[in-house]
Design a protein with these regions (language model features):
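Conserved phosphate/ATP/ADP-binding segment of small-molecule kinases
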Residues: 4-102
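Hydrophobic residues at beta-strand termini and immediately following loops
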Residues: 105
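Conserved post-catalytic alpha-helical subdomain immediately downstream of the catalytic base
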Residues: 78-83, 108-172
């Protein structure tokens, strides 16, 4: 679920998603239209939460908390979720799971031209890995690859496909 906070996803829809989803991945975004009113804590449970640092700060109510403390302690206390990813921009991402300690996965972007859609690409690429039981390192790695590809595209001029992700991963692993 990419929840942009424009009112499309009502509390009753969230309740239904939490009750009926086989796997629920959530990115509740803060933006200029909803800033402060579309927190991930609207979702009482999820299988994977993926949000950026400002969104996490709003959700835990702390302007200065360290990213690893947010992802490994404060967010798990605020939402019933076994896996949480906090995207850190140039810093990559911090991952946490009940079965794993907090880990950092580096960013892979070489050129940044536009940030629009990077979090959406991250979630779209990483959620399937989480759904089939991937490790947090694997989930964060694939998500960061997708995010790196997306920040190299202005707006929505083109999309990211499987071939681009596979090619990028192959290049990184050489």
């Amino acid at each position: 679920v990419n929840d942009f906070g424009h009112g499309l996803i009502a509390p009753s829809t969230i309740e239904l998603l939490c009750r009926r989803s086989k796997f629920l991945a959530v990115n509740a975004q803060s933006n200029s239209a909803n800033f402060g009113f579309n927190l991930v804590t609207r979702y009482p449970c999820a299988d994977l939460v993926c949000i950026d640092t400002p969104e996490a700060r709003l959700a835990v109510g702390s302007k200065f908390m360290d990213a690893s403390e947010m992802v490994g302690r404060a967010l798990p206390a605020a939402i019933n979720c076994d896996r949480i990813i906090l995207t850190l921009g140039r810093g990559g991402c911090s991952t946490w799971a009940k079965a794993e300690d907090v880990q950092t996965v580096p960013a892979f972007a070489k050129t940044v031209v536009d940030l629009v859609g990077a979090g959406d690409a991250f979630l779209a690429a990483s959620a399937p890995i989480a759904a089939v039981g991937g490790t947090m390192q694997q989930i964060g790695f694939v998500g960061n690859v997708a995010g790196a590809l997306k920040v190299g595209i202005v707006g929505h001029r083109s999309s990211i496909d499987r071939a681009a992700i596979v090619k990028s991963i192959s290049g990184l692993l050489k």
